[in-house]
A protein has these predicted regions:
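Conserved phosphate-binding catalytic cores of ATP/NTP-utilizing and phosphoryl-transfer enzymes
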Residues: 27-34, 141-163, 363
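Conserved phosphate-binding/catalytic loops in two-lobed NTP-binding clefts
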Residues: 141-142, 317-318, 335-360, 377
Length: 413
């Protein structure tokens, strides 16, 4: 990839671009209409959407690769890349057509450039840079997790600062959102993300062979079967019980579950790949332990924020977002914590929790309003498969060593 030019060259180009574009009649219409095209290709969803400055979705399109990856047992980066390559032009064109917007009317194009699968990010970035250069439009590089965190502000007025828990198949983090591009990172996953854990457990249980789960993702299958399961039949240990910070770990839990599955397979005299009779109970116990772990770390984050004045004293808010936030059991677990600590829990609707072009466009709108991170089309941008969010405060949280009072996690299915 071409490296970013020097700051001086970028500044010169930006000033030159603003004087030539925003001052010209052809760009005046686009600037006044304030329309943003958002493009998302960070993993296995090809998404595009056009939003106006109020957050109204004028048009959107989404191509999901879920069915393909279900057959292969997980996301294969080269397969995801090829599917993005085959669909991105159509998806963007559909979003524009459904919004009745011509590229000349756009104020900017916002695209996910970090973090995510390198091969997937590359497709979205390459397409976007060609598009903005062809139509002479400003480019807004987007941090995928920032977009998830800010989605709720598109749906209702949520003032900064607020606490956000972002949980998905690839990420898990706790942060204080203090502004559109101002975050304090309180905790992150040390190994794998909760969505990844649920997917791997589902694959180990061969849930794709279950008649109710053949078309569901791993996380969806776990949630469905858990409704009829008895979580008390398997007592999995909640991770990191003696580590008093806000970071997450799910690999150890997955190992516990794998050992329990192997034991039951031996007891029932079946081979791996055959459905266990107790599959609902294992699903329920796994889901409960994931939910409890997320809830406890979030509880500590709330106490840390209160002790350090990081949240407003009146109507403090926890935002829960990301693909795993669609899980209703996990939402209920978090609601127990927010009720006990006096916070308001806000969750975007499930369709906005998973990856989509709408959230990227909205992040672009927020940045456009504040004039932050807006680049002229000629600037080369690199994608970043790994990219932390905000200022890392995890060491300070660990040093505080906040111990939790017990809160009973009685969560109805």
């Amino acid at each position: 990839m071409t490296m970013l030019p020097s700051k001086a060259r970028v500044l010169h180009r930006l000033l030159q671009f603003r004087s030539t574009c925003f001052g010209s009649p052809s760009c005046g219409k686009a600037a006044s209409s304030r329309l943003v095209l958002g493009i998302e290709t960070s993993c296995d969803e090809t998404g595009a959407a056009v939003l106006d400055e109020t957050g109204e979705i004028l048009g959107e399109s989404l191509h999901s690769q879920k069915v393909v990856h279900l057959r292969t047992g997980g996301v294969i980066p080269m397969v995801a890349q090829q599917l993005h390559r085959e669909n991105i032009e159509r998806v963007v064109q559909e979003a524009l057509e459904r919004s009745n917007v011509d590229p000349s009317q756009l104020s900017a194009v916002a695209t996910t450039v970090k973090p995510g699968l390198a091969l997937s990010l590359g497709i979205g970035l390459k397409f976007s840079q060609k598009f903005v250069r062809q139509h002479n439009k400003p480019f807004i590089p987007i941090h995928h997790m920032e977009a998830h965190a800010l989605t709720v502000r598109m749906l209702q007025p949520v003032a900064f600062p607020f606490l956000v828990l972002l949980v998905s198949g690839g990420h898990s983090l706790l942060a204080v959102a203090r502004g559109v591009d101002d975050f304090l990172l309180l905790g992150r996953t040390l190994d794998e993300a909760p969505g990844d854990t649920l997917d791997k457990v589902a694959r180990r249980l061969s849930l794709i062979k279950h008649p109710q789960c053949s078309t569901l993702s791993g996380g969806q299958a776990i949630e469905l079967l858990a409704k009829d399961g008895d979580r008390t039949r398997f007592r999995f240990t909640t991770p990191m019980g003696q580590t008093y910070d806000c970071c997450f770990s799910f690999a150890g839990l997955r190992n516990q579950v794998t050992m329990a599955i192997m034991k039951k397979e031996a007891e029932e005299g079946i081979e791996q790949g055959t459905l266990l009779s107790c599959v609902n109970d294992i699903a329920a116990a796994t889901q409960h332990t994931v939910a409890t772990h997320l809830a406890k770390r979030t509880h500590r984050a709330i106490l840390f924020c209160k002790a350090n004045g990081l949240l407003p004293s009146s109507s403090p808010t926890l935002v829960l977002s990301g693909g795993v936030a669609s899980n209703q059991y996990i939402r209920k677990a978090l609601s127990i914590i927010t009720e006990a600590t006096g916070l308001q829990l806000l969750c975007p609707p499930a369709k906005f929790c998973t990856d989509n072009g709408v959230m990227i466009a909205w992040n672009g709108v927020e940045r456009l309003r504040e004039g932050k991170g807006i680049l002229p089309p000629s600037v080369d941008v690199c994608y970043e498969p790994k990219a932390p969010l905000g200022v890392d405060m995890t060491a300070e949280v660990k040093a505080a060593a906040i111990r939790l009072q017990s809160i009973r996690m009685k969560i109805p299915n």
